[in-house]
Amino acid sequence: MSIMDDLMEGRIKLYEIERHVPVDEAVRIRREFIERTCGVKLEHVSNYSIDMERASRRNIENPIGVVQIPLGVAGPLRVRGEHADGEYYVPLATSEGALVASVNRGCSVITRAGGATVRVTGDSMTRAPVIRTGSVVEALQLREWIYENMDALREEAESTTRHGKLVKIDPIIVAGSYVYPRFVYTTGDSMGMNMVTIATERALELLTRETGAHVIALSGNLCTDKKPAAVNLIEGRGKSITAEITVPGEMVESVLKTTPEAVVEVNTAKNLIGSAAAGSMGFNAHYANIIGAIFLATGQDEAHIVEGSLGVTIAEERKGDLYFAVNLPDVPLATVGGGTGLETASECLDIMGVRGGGRVHAFAEIVGGAVLAGELSLMGALAAGHLARAHSELGRG
């Protein structure tokens, strides 16, 4: 009997194939099983160049192949950061026609205007468990215990990692008899979710041993991971980034085909008032477009795109020129670990010169500049009334 026969008869499970054959053969068998079972032909999914054996150990379970997304590049983008200072080409993986062209136009404006000033204003990764006590009185006592034993909790947490540092535990929210302490770490060049989860678990072992409180879940959603949340908008998570540019008025008119005053009005009416009316926490036009395209290109955790959608765009007319800024409080990023080791992701990080250790802040500054470029271009198109035409010509439906 063949492995395929065993699969079809239910004698082995899809996840068990690698116990019998090498990874590449297991991928082929699993894919053929899906083709037979679902009545499809997966000729494109089966074509790839990445090391699937390595990926199956680190990035994927039950692999059957690879999905391909068109990859474009925007630039050069002049970035004036503390860690990234130069002209960069930004890889963007997307299936949305007109997106790369729009970001590219923004890069052109920014570079011609002297470059984007970009700063990383915050750097943290968080994990917030939920802990049960017997009453609100006990909950408040536990909160006080955490404050008083911060050094001991830090020692326990940091004993699990060479790179993670517990900066603070704040806020500590009490809701009835439940306590939600938000553990805040720095994590070096990795995104750090696994790191802070393991570190927090170790700290909680001390807490439960000393207080008798019961940890309901290692994540109580005050983190807040992979969801839009006001706590992240206010406190920050991942890399907090601000990028700004002052575009001369004549350049706004000649390149963006509009005026500084028109861009300011669109930003106020759309990004500020419109977002408030909708109850949105994204006071911007489309941060997620650029964040998503960069994340997919560079092997970031795609579920964090929703966090990168948070933030506020600022536009002001200053003596006939346009001051334009983007503020992204919550962009989890990595240049090591996770999906960054996949061959295509590594190449895309190499395009920007940010692969490997010691480069995550440079990466963050380039990301901020790219979001600024995309936001500036779209706001210019909206102010000029060109959005529908651009999508008609480049999006093609």
From Swiss-Prot:
Alphabetically ordered keywords of this record: Isoprene biosynthesis, NADP, Oxidoreductase
Enzyme Commission code:
1.1.1.34
Q: Which reaction does it catalyse?
A: (R)-mevalonate + 2 NADP(+) + CoA = (3S)-3-hydroxy-3-methylglutaryl-CoA + 2 NADPH + 2 H(+)
Query: Which CDD domains does the UniProt entry name for this protein?
Result: HMG-CoA_reductase_classI
Identify the catalytic residues: E96, D301, H391
Spell out the molecular function terms from Gene Ontology.
Answer: hydroxymethylglutaryl-CoA reductase (NADPH) activity
Report the top EC class in one word: oxidoreductase
Please give one Pfam family short name.
Answer: HMG-CoA_red
Q: Which residues cross the membrane?
A: none
What is one GO biological process annotated to this record? isoprenoid biosynthetic process
Q: In which pathway does it act?
A: Metabolic intermediate biosynthesis; (R)-mevalonate biosynthesis; (R)-mevalonate from acetyl-CoA: step 3/3
- Family under the similarity heading: Belongs to the HMG-CoA reductase family.
Q: What does this protein do?
A: Converts HMG-CoA to mevalonate.
Task: From the Swiss-Prot or TrEMBL record, give the protein name.
Answer: 3-hydroxy-3-methylglutaryl-coenzyme A reductase
Gene name, Swiss-Prot/TrEMBL: hmgA
